[in-house]
Amino acid sequence: MAEAKIEEIGCEDRISVLPEDLLVVILDLLPTKDVVATMILSKRWLSIWTMVRTLEYTDDMDDESKKSVWWFLNKSLQLHKAPVIDSLCMELGPQCPTTDDVDIGKWVAKAVDCLVMTLTIKLLWSAGPTSLPKSLYSCTSLSELTLSDQILVNVPSSAYLPSLTELELICVVYKDEDSLVSFLSSCPVLEFLFVLRKIDDNVKTFTVKVPSLLELTYKNLCSDVVDNTDRCLVVNAPAVNTCQITDYSLESFSIEDMPCLQDATIDVDEAYHPDDKFLTSFSSVLSLRMHLSDAMVMRCTTINFSRLIKLSIYPYGPDMLETLLRLLGNAPKLKEFLVDYPSLIASQKFVYNPEDLPWSWKQPSHVPECLSSQLEIFEWRDYGDRIIEEEFLTYVLANSKRLKTATISLRLNLEDPELIIEEIKDLPRVSTTSHLLFK
């Protein structure tokens, strides 16, 4: 027992004699509450924690009965002495008090003064949206910023964020459209933008005009907007190479040419009727994922996707397999093709199931070029074994001369799935080297 105690003390001594800078680096890897707790270890440890450069304060969002982290946040930041803060995260839930002495702004200002590089502020408290210090919008060191929920984005005309490369705006409220425009225009090197909108965010025309932007993710999941008149998404970002647009609000779109675009995802309300200009903006992509309504797929058949290599489609409607082949005819370089019939999508609205498919279809007289000379990978998810599905699958397998793999995932609760698999295995395949896989 005595030897074990001596060994324990020796181990403690070896840690304690490390240089303070190294101890701070080690503490930066631990949760902030554990870091502060080290002050009780010894006199030397009493102040080491005050020099850490990574701070995270997060309320338990799943248990509102727990005491808010606010008091710990407020006290520990009062004692914090590091001249530089690399990262500060403050996520306050409904249990956070909303009295006048709860001042998030002063700690944001402190982080700015300490040349913060990564800042996350998420406010789910019961109070209304709160403004942040104007100094935040002129922080020269800030490279990553996340603003979420009860935050009022009120950007001064003097805003300038010369180092900001990543920005997330999640369910915030904007003072007005000018604040949004000023915010984005103040970020000359912004490369990544993630936007999740709420219904009442004070913006009708959401303008993204960022010449440096490389990746855009825009989500508007508000399908129950009462008045969507004049609501519009405007994108002018010529350097974007990855773009995801998810919008169930039926707002309109104005998308400028994106000549560098390589990867795109389009998921809009099934009632939305796109124009040619909207879809043409995505005609140069290499990889495309689309949640297709009948109107969407018909528009796509008139657009030439000359560079498209990978296509994933998620049909809303039941009667579009014939039209899909016309779309494939406009994608001569297509090598990967995925068809997925989801029964429930992110908007929480039910869509057509495979059992709703019509019984038969009319085969085209001309085989799409991509099937005869390019397609290598084909996947069908939620295959329902209806006649039209079997005919479509038969057509693809019989005409895809360079096919390497075809993967079929059967719809749940199908009767006799083993028999269906055997029937699919018996379908003729023009590519003798192709493999059939089942999930």
UniProtKB/Swiss-Prot annotation:
The lineage of its organism: Eukaryota, Viridiplantae, Streptophyta, Embryophyta, Tracheophyta. It comes from Arabidopsis thaliana. Residues 360-410 form the FBD domain. SUPFAM superfamilies: F-box domain, RNI-like. It holds the Pfam family LRR_At5g56370. Coiled coil: none annotated. InterPro entries: F-box-like_dom_sf (IPR036047), F-box_dom (IPR001810), FBD (IPR006566), FBL13/AtMIF1-like (IPR050232), LRR_dom_sf (IPR032675), LRR_FXL15/At3g58940/PEG3-like (IPR055411). Residues 12-58 form the F-box domain. This is Putative FBD-associated F-box protein At1g05080.
